[in-house]
């Protein structure tokens, strides 16, 4: 992880700020679709700050610069930021939020600027109200100033072809999905809905793309009314197959024309003499720029996207695909970890973290329906495992130490599903502390996996189950316990999840949700432990049914051994020990057929799935 000298970039940015009479400028991580993962052309925050993590906000005043990020990235940011930058540790006492820092820099009637395409209306309103209290103001700066600094070196926007996602994997036609959406519009008495989240558009139309690394989406907007369907996308990306799939009912319009069309809709609504024209729905994650084009608060109803809610509840075909792809993915992981142990221990091969990650990708790519990785593989040895979202890079990454803990968080895209799995192994002799920490984390994973709870329970409520064993020791981890996972879509999706985010209190876990279960523990400078399975919520039978409501539990689909020599069986209850042994028996049963002609991997798998006892 190298530090980038940002002095020249900041000088140029401040010149542009001065020309536009902006005193403080905000650079969010997101693109104009509020995407978590972004295309290289949208990496503005990384370009201006040098920090390459996926989450964070940069704020630049005329004399200072600050970068705010969360606990996953404190170590990484401290290494990558140069002396021009202050690191604001989100959620840590003594550090201001980026909003507080911005307000402090803007005291005395100063102007704060931001590209309105990169923030939500709610975010803009909240900051604007805070700034007003000290006489300052927030303005939208439509021409992105970082783009001007970047100039001709900025990567070109992607122009790859869009593909049809067949019904055999989608499980439902796009016409049915739009029909369901129109029922929602009718229920809300809405004029229509403008959609800007890329995974929602890909899911709704049963299309996939490659515009953003690891996320099979394409740059687009959509406008759905009770009688029309408009898809805003660069038509050059649409193959004859895609056009035939969409048919005559979907009108294709230029990508950028959404803003002009939104303004026209807003003007038409203003002309309504009755003053009672229905509003358009807009996701509360859409951009401030889109909201302004539609006429702002008065003409738009900001809602949690009904498409996000529908997408999060997988249909039977999608759930079957998830089960199937996780077995193939598990086989790839088994082959990989067996290979890695053989190279490190038996052959004494020198391998760095990237060599190992590349090998895992090569193994995965042999499996049916493979369509690429779902995120950058986190291949980390020893102390690098404590960097929660560590990204190894050739030339600066570490050689894998066979006497240290090795943490690998990885995932893949398959046509029938998306995977995300973390395994922590030690190919030598782990210390008592490492075994204790691993076992406490494992107990948390099992606690979520075996949870039974009434319908209506949120992931916020479940989160403490995963942390309870660490908490008893005065330990914790600085990330969520679980996030939603797409079906051959984004590896991170909402609206539900397991963690302490306020939004998780608002959305209960529902049957059909696919979520990660990933507690961890990190000893800075020494090692990191995380165990992650993908689980699917489903209705379960209980002896009683208090309140006459359905009760839910989980089904795990990840099939890979847990790292047997790191488990301290004396710390497990009888039920937990039974769970581990049954899980390993299931892994063997589902995956050993892949290794009929690979004696080494088969024997490794047999060893790693043997029952353990106290």
Swiss-Prot record:
<dbReference type="InterPro" id="IPR000994">
    <property type="entry name" value="Pept_M24"/>
</dbReference>
<keyword id="KW-0479">Metal-binding</keyword>
<feature type="binding site">
    <location>
        <position position="409"/>
    </location>
    <ligand>
        <name>Mn(2+) 2</name>
    </ligand>
</feature>
<dbReference type="InterPro" id="IPR000587">
    <property type="entry name" value="Creatinase_N"/>
</dbReference>
<dbReference type="Pfam" id="PF16189">
    <property type="entry name" value="Creatinase_N_2"/>
</dbReference>
<feature type="binding site">
    <location>
        <position position="420"/>
    </location>
    <ligand>
        <name>Mn(2+) 2</name>
    </ligand>
</feature>
<dbReference type="InterPro" id="IPR001131">
    <property type="entry name" value="Peptidase_M24B_aminopep-P_CS"/>
</dbReference>
<feature type="binding site">
    <location>
        <position position="518"/>
    </location>
    <ligand>
        <name>Mn(2+) 1</name>
    </ligand>
</feature>
<dbReference type="Pfam" id="PF16188">
    <property type="entry name" value="Peptidase_M24_C"/>
</dbReference>
<feature type="binding site">
    <location>
        <position position="420"/>
    </location>
    <ligand>
        <name>Mn(2+) 1</name>
    </ligand>
</feature>
<dbReference type="GO" id="GO:0070006">
    <property type="term" value="F:metalloaminopeptidase activity"/>
</dbReference>
<keyword id="KW-0482">Metalloprotease</keyword>
<dbReference type="GO" id="GO:0005737">
    <property type="term" value="C:cytoplasm"/>
</dbReference>
<dbReference type="Pfam" id="PF00557">
    <property type="entry name" value="Peptidase_M24"/>
</dbReference>
<keyword id="KW-0031">Aminopeptidase</keyword>
<dbReference type="InterPro" id="IPR036005">
    <property type="entry name" value="Creatinase/aminopeptidase-like"/>
</dbReference>
<dbReference type="GO" id="GO:0006508">
    <property type="term" value="P:proteolysis"/>
</dbReference>
<dbReference type="InterPro" id="IPR050422">
    <property type="entry name" value="X-Pro_aminopeptidase_P"/>
</dbReference>
<dbReference type="InterPro" id="IPR029149">
    <property type="entry name" value="Creatin/AminoP/Spt16_N"/>
</dbReference>
<keyword id="KW-0378">Hydrolase</keyword>
<dbReference type="InterPro" id="IPR032416">
    <property type="entry name" value="Peptidase_M24_C"/>
</dbReference>
<keyword id="KW-0645">Protease</keyword>
<dbReference type="InterPro" id="IPR033740">
    <property type="entry name" value="Pept_M24B"/>
</dbReference>
<dbReference type="Pfam" id="PF01321">
    <property type="entry name" value="Creatinase_N"/>
</dbReference>
<comment type="similarity">
    <text>Belongs to the peptidase M24B family.</text>
</comment>
<feature type="binding site">
    <location>
        <position position="532"/>
    </location>
    <ligand>
        <name>Mn(2+) 1</name>
    </ligand>
</feature>
<comment type="function">
    <text>Catalyzes the removal of a penultimate prolyl residue from the N-termini of peptides.</text>
</comment>
<protein>
    <recommendedName>
        <fullName>Probable Xaa-Pro aminopeptidase P</fullName>
        <ecNumber>3.4.11.9</ecNumber>
    </recommendedName>
</protein>
<feature type="binding site">
    <location>
        <position position="532"/>
    </location>
    <ligand>
        <name>Mn(2+) 2</name>
    </ligand>
</feature>
<dbReference type="GO" id="GO:0046872">
    <property type="term" value="F:metal ion binding"/>
</dbReference>
<keyword id="KW-0464">Manganese</keyword>
């Amino acid at each position: 992880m190298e530090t980038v000298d940002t002095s020249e970039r900041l000088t140029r940015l401040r010149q542009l700020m001065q020309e536009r009479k902006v005193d403080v400028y905000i650079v969010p991580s997101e693109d104009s679709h509020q995407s978590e993962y972004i295309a290289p052309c949208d990496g503005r925050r990384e370009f201006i700050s040098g920090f390459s993590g996926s989450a964070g906000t940069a704020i630049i005043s005329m004399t200072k610069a600050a970068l705010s990020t969360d606990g996953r990235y404190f170590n990484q940011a401290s290494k990558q930021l140069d002396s021009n930058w202050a690191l604001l540790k989100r959620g840590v006492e003594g550090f201001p939020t980026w909003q507080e820092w911005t307000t402090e820099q803007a005291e005395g009637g100063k102007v704060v600027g931001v590209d309105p395409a990169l923030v939500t209306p709610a975010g803009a309103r909240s900051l604007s109200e805070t700034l007003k209290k000290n006489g300052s103001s927030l303005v939208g700066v439509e021409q992105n100033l970082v783009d001007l600094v970047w100039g001709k070196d900025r990567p070109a926007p992607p122009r790859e072809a869009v593909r049809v996602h067949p019904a055999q994997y989608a499980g439902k036609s796009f016409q049915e999905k739009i029909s369901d959406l129109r029922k929602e519009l009718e229920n809300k008495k809405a004029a229509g809905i403008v959609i800007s989240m890329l995974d929602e558009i890909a899911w709704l139309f049963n299309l996939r793309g490659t515009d953003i690394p690891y996320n099979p989406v394409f740059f687009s907007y959509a406008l759905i009314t009770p009688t029309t369907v408009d898809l805003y996308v660069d038509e050059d990306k649409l193959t004859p197959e895609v056009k035939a799939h969409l048919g005559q009912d979907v009108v294709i319009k230029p990508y950028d024309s959404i803003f002009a069309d939104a303004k026209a809709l807003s003007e038409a609504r203003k002309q309504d003499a009755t003053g009672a024209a229905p509003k358009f729905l807009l996701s509360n994650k859409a951009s401030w720029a889109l909201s302004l084009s539609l006429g702002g608060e008065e003409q738009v109803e900001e809602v949690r996207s009904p498409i996000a809610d529908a997408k999060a509840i997988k249909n039977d075909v999608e759930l079957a695909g998830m089960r199937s792809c996780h077995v193939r993915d598990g086989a790839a992981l088994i082959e990989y970890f067996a290979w890695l142990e053989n190279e490190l221990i038996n052959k004494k091969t020198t391998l760095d973290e990237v060599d190992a990650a590349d090998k895992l990708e090569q193994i995965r790519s042999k499996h049916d329906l493979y369509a690429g990785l779902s995120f950058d593989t986190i291949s980390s040895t020893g102390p690098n495992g404590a960097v929660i979202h560590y990204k190894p890079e050739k030339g600066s990454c570490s050689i894998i130490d066979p006497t240290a803990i090795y943490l690998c968080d990885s995932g893949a895209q398959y046509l029938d599903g998306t995977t995300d799995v973390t395994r922590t192994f030690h190919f030598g002799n782990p210390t008592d502390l490492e075994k204790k920490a691993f076992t406490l984390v494992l107990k948390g994973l099992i606690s979520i996996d075996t949870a039974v709870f009434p319908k209506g329970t949120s992931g916020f409520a479940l989160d403490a189950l995963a942390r309870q064993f660490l908490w008893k020791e005065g330990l914790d981890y600085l990330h969520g316990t679980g996030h939603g996972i797409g079906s051959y879509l984004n590896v991170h999706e909402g609206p539900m999840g397991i963690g302490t985010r306020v939004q998780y209190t608002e959305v209960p876990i529902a049957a059909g949700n696919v979520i990660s279960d990933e507690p961890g523990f990190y000893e800075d400078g020494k090692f990191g432990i995380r165990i992650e399975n993908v689980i699917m919520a489903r209705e379960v039978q209980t002896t009683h049914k208090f309140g006459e409501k359905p009760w839910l539990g989980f089904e795990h689909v990840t099939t890979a051994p847990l790292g047997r020599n790191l488990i301290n069986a004396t710390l497990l209850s009888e039920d937990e020990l039974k769970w581990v042994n049954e899980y390993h028996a299931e892994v063997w049963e589902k995956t050993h057929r892949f290794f009929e002609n690979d004696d080494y991997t088969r024997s490794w798998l047999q060893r790693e799935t043997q029952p353990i006892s106290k």
